[in-house]
A protein has these predicted regions:
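Conserved HGGG/HGGXW glycine-rich cap/lid loop of the alpha/beta-hydrolase fold
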Residues: 11-67
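Acidic beta-to-alpha connecting loop that harbors the catalytic carboxylate
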Residues: 32, 238-240, 265-267
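Conserved acidic catalytic loop of the alpha/beta-hydrolase fold
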Residues: 78-96
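Conserved hydrolase catalytic core segment
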Residues: 94-137
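Alpha/beta-hydrolase
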Residues: 139-223, 230, 250
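Short beta-strand/loop motif that positions the catalytic acidic residue
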Residues: 228, 234-236
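Conserved alpha/beta-hydrolase "acid-adjacent" motif
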Residues: 241-247
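Catalytic active-site module of serine/aspartate enzymes centered on a nucleophile-bearing elbow/loop
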Residues: 257-290
Length: 290
């Protein structure tokens, strides 16, 4: 493992490379409010052993990257996409496969729209298409108002917990995100939580994380998805409470030539049971996109 601090404008990003230096690069873009250490170690190892140079990094305001107050220093998903490009530049990587989970899928979609020359492929999981009024749907989940597109809102229990995270333990929150069809390894999650906290030893917990304050209207880019030429794979998680089916299918249908793969039993959580199926899907897609 090699570590490197990389500058993106006036922000410093902590980054790490795992795998053979000359292997095809795989850039990991995590979920919102998550650092590089939120990627399960077993999954990272499997991806590296499968022949990828895995690049993971701390978003701004996470881990060991630059932390600043958001209102005086606002940014949006376009800035996060530019940060991702800076990571590639910092490691001397011309092109990479971008794997995005949750918010990282939005970053990957923007990379495919605005920086397609830097990509070999994208894999999207735990996300929705850009024509979905995601932030408005949180309110609709609470009021019962129908969505603008007929697609489902996040499940009400998730929105209620997201607005009141102290009502359950962190482990219980992730247990619910994972769903009830796959084994839930509490000890593995606790180790991951401990690793995240140790990695960000100087980070003070905040109630309103900057990522949660981004309110960029990405629906303005919805029509642009039809212009994506980067080979795309969408992973469907049948038990995802944030983007329930058929969101993944709708996302795949919004991108020309995109393939859809379902991982049975998966929720909005990278449970140990999905690490090998996800690695297999990503590896096969990288081969198809090269």
């Amino acid at each position: 493992m090699r570590e490197r601090i990389i500058r993106s404008g006036d922000v410093e990003l902590w980054t790490q490379a795992i795998g053979e230096p000359d292997a095809p690069a795989l850039l990991l873009n995590a979920g919102d409010c998550q650092s590089s250490m939120d990627w399960p170690e077993d999954l990272v190892r499997l991806l590296a052993d499968a022949g990828h140079l895995v690049l993971r990094y701390d978003y701004r305001d996470t881990g060991r990257s630059t932390h600043r107050e958001f209102p005086p220093n606002p940014y949006d998903f376009d800035d996060l996409a530019r940060d991702a490009v800076a990571v590639l530049d910092g490691w001397g990587i011309e092109r990479a496969h971008s794997l995005g989970f949750g918010m990282g899928s939005a970053v990957s979609q923007l990379l495919a729209l605005d920086h397609r020359e830097r990509l070999t492929a994208i894999t999207l999981l735990g996300s929705c298409a850009m024509d979905v009024d995601f932030f408005g749907n949180w309110e609709r989940a609470l009021t019962g108002e129908p969505t603008l597109d007929g697609l489902p809102t996040p499940e009400r229990w998730f929105v209620e917990l997201a607005f009141n995270p102290a009502s359950v333990s962190e482990i219980e929150f992730y247990r619910r995100l994972s769903g009830d069809q796959l084994p839930f390894d509490e000890s593995e999650l606790q180790q991951r939580i401990d690793r995240v906290r140790a990695h960000a030893a100087d980070e003070e917990p905040v109630e309103d994380h900057p990522h949660g304050q981004i309110r960029q209207d990405w629906t303005k880019r919805a029509a642009d998805l039809a212009g994506i030429t980067t080979p795309a794979l969408v992973i469907e998680a049948p038990l995802d409470p944030i983007h329930p089916p058929p969101h993944a299918r709708h996302l795949a249908e919004s991108i020309p030539g995109a393939r859809l793969t379902t991982i049975p039993g998966m929720g909005h959580y990278l449970a140990p049971a999905i690490h090998q199926p996800l690695t297999d899907a990503v590896t096969a897609h990288v081969g198809a996109g090269m």
